[in-house]
Amino acid sequence: MKGKKDGLNKQVHIYSIDTSAFYNDQENKLHNKILKSYRYRDHLRKLEHVDKKHKKYITQRIISLKEKLYNAFNDHNQIRTLRTDSLKDNNVISLFDSVLTRTLGIKENSLSEEIMVVQTYHFQILRDIIDKGFIHNNEKYVYFTSSAGQIRTKKSCFIKQSTLDKYQNALTCGLSVEHINAQGGSSINKWNSYMALSNSASSSWEIDIDKAIVVNDLETNVSSLVDYIDRDTYEITRKIMDIPIEHTDGCGMMLPSLSQKSFMVRLPWVKGLLVPFDFRKFAEKHSSFIVKDVYGKEWDIIKDDIQIIFTKSQFKMWKYYDSWDDYRYKFKKYGCLGAKLNEEDPSVEGKLTYQMLQTLTDITDEELKQISSKTVSEITQLGTDKETMMKVLGATEKNKHKTSLQEALLIYPELLNDDHTKEIIKNKKKSMIKDAKSGKLLVSDARYTYLCPDLYAFCERLFLGIESPKGLLSGSDVHCSLYDEGYIDILRSPHLFREHGVRWNKKNEEYEKWFITPGVYTSIHDPISKLLQFDNDGDKALIISDELIVNIAKRNMADIVPLYYEMSVAQKQEINSRNIYEALTLAYGINIGEYSNNITKIWNSDNINLDVIKWLCMENNFTIDFAKTLFMPTRPDHVDEKIKDYIKNKVPHFFINAKDKEEHSVESINESTVNKLDSIIPSDRINFAAVAGKFDYRFLLKNKEIKLNEAVINEYKRLDRNKKWLMNDEEAKPGQKLYVYKIIKQKLLEIHNDDGFITDVLVKHLYKKKSKYKSTLWECFGDIVLENIKHNLKTFKGCCICGKAFKPTSNKAKYCQSCGKKKERDKYKKYNKKRINHR
């Protein structure tokens, strides 16, 4: 999809700083003294013989300095000022294009100071800047939002007050904090996450808001056998219960004329998945065209030309608007923007993870070898099989976000024989072995696809008013057009309890007519959403049709039913600086990974207790919601004792590969399912074979006679050495190093303002000396190298013998001049020898 590709190719750059950037001079002096003391303490630790009094002195000095620093924080009562010396190149991060960057008009590839990210190390300073804001360049900045991802890393987003004043209505569709507070406030962390919707990496979506409505969700009671956990006593009771399930939780519909593919959407206060479903055809079939929106107003979907139906679960702040017309009017008045993201792409190959594998506890060695065979084959073929090498390098037509190097490999595969490409493959192989030993296994025909509800059942409720709709899918059947009729295993991450949704994939013409996407559609009579813990706002499932895995999953799911317990409701509060600060500090204290790791300890132990895992799964979900609900169940003493007894061990041995743990911090290897992979996955060194024609670097040059330029080469070496310092952001993803390479490119162009010249100089320098490390060249000038290759392939050919570029005199020409002459001489010698022998 062009829009998606454009959205994920565009980036802007902003500063990401930490709370030390707001120190006053006294605090900064104390901070530097503490750092100096830490360095001295580290120096003492390296010495063999140190007088105890030195250790005692430095420890007490650090404690004393910290106390002085905290006192200085408390003494500071003015608005804080950003220290300009903190705005360094290594504090720049890259953001993908989003509603926020588009609304603010931040130009692509520019460095903007409209917004800044602040990471918290000292809570007193966070409290100050949330309460009073901060000053930079005579502009006041105020707290804007913190997304779920930012909360996990104690980060917050701040915005220029003048910018917020200008664009606030466009970002909030005219819904002010004052208006929310006048109606009783909101859950702070929910409000935070809804404000952060504008931050999502996305592409622009031209939505006609007048052709959209919002209706009530489809909720029904589903009768099911469950393990009911009493959240007060922790007692687990297996019984049949009527479970309320909101089948359309986060999901809406659009006419297929708008899009044949599902995608996620973002509008102010609106998020979720839109699935193409022809609700007009449904209305015409039943001659019923009137639907009610969430406010009770009736709409004729034909006369009103309704093309999109959102659900109440998608419209997060619907209660704060007077009507849907109120929202539509403000959306247009303030120039609000729509966005689309994650358009479905089932071509992405799926992989099993350790969480999915570890719950298959009775798997045999032979079965595990079979399941691992595709991964083992790919690892062993790396270096000798061209297709495998191209695939792991991402040089495939399926890859929609190809880099210049990946594009170049597709048109000039001889690059596979270059040392730089070989180095990438070597590192890729190490990574593949590590991944495989930690449970990431390739499975034939495994695909990721969206989880979709039975929208036919939704229309039966919406258009026909049927309280207990039947829908198209009956029982626990599912429909996914990617697979033939038969059993499939539906999986979702995180996978904590035994959560293999083995279901019958039903195929018929009626399903194909209504369910037009490759998503997996689930029945409204099936509690599968409780088993797999999903909603339908864009959650993806991994679908596996492999018969062996499906049968193993079936075997392990015998006697497993969904877990059920009553969750708490989010608490409303007034949105103000004090409550925002308190909500953030609560959220910062949550460690969801701890529960996941403790559950993994039990699955990989020699004594698996399902009840303990059930309790931990429940606690995990309460922990996730804690920042919103402020409720956490209290363990009874006997339960606490039992849980602690089971989680006292270290994490499993495979965490050396899965989480980079040291040998001393993991358990000894045992016979658990994932640990067994250690002996199945090969770790032998890579051996390269010539898999394509001979490589000639001159195909990468525009000017074949280019002379080396020492000034350019020396500056390149200096910048290449220093790029690690520039790439300071621990979270920066491979696609987010753009700013660093932008700086390097600018510095090189200051020496010689001709990027074609610089590219040729660097290509000749790096490829002639057979450097293994050419990433900076490809990141900075890869587009020019790619154009050079394209041009040269039209003009030159690679000699079939030596690989060198030559200008062919005819289409049949295969050899360069010297090899051609040698070939002719050899041919003549052979002919003469044959003639003499014949005589």
Curated annotation (Swiss-Prot):
Coiled coil: none annotated. It is an enzyme of class 2 (transferase). Its EC number is 2.7.7.6. It catalyses: RNA(n) + a ribonucleoside 5'-triphosphate = RNA(n+1) + diphosphate. The keyword Electron transport does not apply. One of its GO terms (molecular function) is metal ion binding. One of its GO terms (cellular component) is DNA-directed RNA polymerase complex. Mg(2+) binds at D535, D537, D539. The keyword Magnesium applies. Keywords: DNA-directed RNA polymerase, Magnesium, Manganese, Metal-binding, Nucleotidyltransferase, Transcription, Transferase. Its cofactor is Mg(2+); Mn(2+). Disruption phenotype: No longer forms lytic phage. Uses Mg(2+) and Mn(2+) equivalently. Induction: No expression under phage non-inducing conditions; induced by mitomycin C (at protein level). Belongs to the YRH RNA polymerase family. Encoded by the SPbeta prophage. A single subunit DNA-dependent RNA polymerase (RNAP) that catalyzes the transcription of DNA into RNA using the four ribonucleoside triphosphates (rNTPs) as substrates. The enzyme is more highly processive than the multisubunit RNAP from E.coli but is considerably more error-prone. It has no detectable proof-reading function but can perform pyrophosphorolysis. Transcribes the late genes of the SPbeta prophage starting from yonK (approximately 35 genes are encoded in the prophage downstream from yonK). This is DNA-directed RNA polymerase YonO.
